[in-house]
């Protein structure tokens, strides 16, 4: 049940971010809306959210979640462009979080750049950590043609 709940939370965060990105600028005489593009998902609590700036995301999750490590980050575009999703958890490296077995709506098959923060990040072609995979150390402005827009799950257990 926890896996279903956390997968739902990740999908909800992705949908909220995607909805914010799809909001038309300048609709009906309103000021243009800056899209939310900085998303965070904390696996241990199921907390997630998307914000229009990194400082808003840090303010929302930073102080309350010092026990959690920033494991890694993915972006929807190359060169850390587009939307960003940061994965946080208490287990750290060497652990395959079941909650990351499916990137869910909004992030599935959209990853173009990745960064392993606390440890290397592995992108998997299919959900449930199946199919072709590539492990990245540090920041990678482009995940390469073999994995670009193909990742469906993420792990932090391979070196």
Which role does the model predict for each range below?
Residues 2-18, 23-159:
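Compact beta-sheet-dominated domain cores in extracellular/mature segments
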